[in-house]
């Protein structure tokens, strides 16, 4: 009951605010001229700053970009690769040879290090023999690795076999 009392009855608007009178009032009003100080600021601002997009017509902006102008990311990447290849070709042959030699030297430098590392490990094992527990752990890890490798090979072989079976069954039909 309290809610019903609090609600206001919608009253119709007075007759003076009818639809036609609203339209007539809007049409009769004249636009007010801007203040002279405001106009001078706007004019000076527009003279000082001309945006390039403002010079374009709206129609030009709405035109879709032609497919010739659009570049796919793949084309852009391929152009970059071509440019980099041209740069490499433009380099003097001495620079290319130097780079190749440096790469070869790095590979050669690693081989003695690997050999030395293996020799050092063997020497360390001879000097400090492993305890039974450590050797047992190493053997267990080696067995696990071997079993994983065998399992992968079995899976690979079974997949290849299943593919061959599928091909044979397709040929039979």
UniProtKB/Swiss-Prot annotation:
Q: State the residue spans of region: Disordered.
A: 1-173
Instruction: Give the source's domain of life in one word.
Output: Eukaryota
Start-end of Basic and acidic residues biased regions: 1-11, 56-109, 120-144, 157-173
> What spans are recorded as compositionally biased (Basic residues)?
145-156
Q: Where is the composition biased (Polar residues)?
A: 17-41
This chain belongs to which protein, by name?
Answer: Uncharacterized protein T15H9.5
């Amino acid at each position: 009951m309290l809610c019903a009392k609090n609600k206001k009855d919608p009253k119709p608007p007075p007759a003076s605010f009818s639809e036609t009178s609203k339209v007539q009032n809007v049409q009769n009003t004249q636009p007010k001229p801007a203040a002279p100080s405001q106009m001078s600021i706007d004019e000076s601002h527009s003279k000082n700053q001309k945006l390039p997009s403002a010079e374009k017509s709206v129609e030009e902006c709405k035109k879709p970009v032609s497919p010739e102008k659009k570049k796919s990311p793949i084309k852009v990447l391929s152009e970059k690769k071509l440019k980099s290849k041209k740069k490499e070709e433009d380099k003097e042959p001495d620079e290319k040879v130097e780079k190749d030699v440096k790469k070869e030297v790095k590979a050669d430098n690693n081989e003695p290090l690997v050999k030395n590392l293996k020799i050092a490990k063997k020497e360390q094992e001879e000097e400090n023999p492993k305890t039974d527990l450590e050797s047992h752990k190493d053997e267990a890890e080696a067995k696990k690795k071997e079993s994983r490798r065998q399992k992968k090979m079995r899976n690979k072989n079974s997949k290849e076999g299943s593919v061959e079976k599928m091909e044979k069954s397709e040929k039979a039909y």
